[in-house]
Amino acid sequence: EVRAKAEKAFPAIYEAATHWKPKDAGKEVKDVPAYPAKRVKITGTYADLIRIMYQRKWSAGLPVIPPTPEAVAAMLKGTKKDPSEIVWLVPPRMGQLTVELVATYGVMAGCKPEHMPLLLAVVEAFKNPSVDWQGSTTTTAATVPVMVISGPILDKLGIGYSSGELGSFMPVNTSVGYFINLVGDIIGG
């Protein structure tokens, strides 16, 4: 009797597991304008800043560099792109990632203005459909984004590429990795 019930239910379970998509998947989130980003003033200690940003789902709860207007403006000097340009609708929530938000999350992750072209290139790479960002960020399997960067930019930006490049003493590697995690977790949802 149990087997018959399971066999009867299996086609619907299989269909839901392999073809289901959220009803809003692929649609742009329009309830909040992407640019200019909302400005807020937070007073208190650095620990208060980290706690408040985490409570409001603006960070992952780990330490960040405060994205002050001055720091974001300095970061934007690393690109000629318009700050209002939407560079990616980040799955699965399809949050709008603008150039200004790339700069903001770059600051928070510890990146420098000279890293902006790399951050924008990373975004461009991860939004490629062949990467399947949505699949890798919504699976229950253990996944982690991986970037392969090559060429003169490695030495120019101080990107580690020898022994220990995945270790903690490679600040550019760590900052760029933290940046993409913040974008995925906060903008993508």
Q: Which residues does each PLM region occupy?
A:
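A charged, well-structured terminal subsegment
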Residues: 2-27
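Non-transmembrane, aqueous-exposed alpha-helical and coiled segments at domain scale
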Residues: 32-189
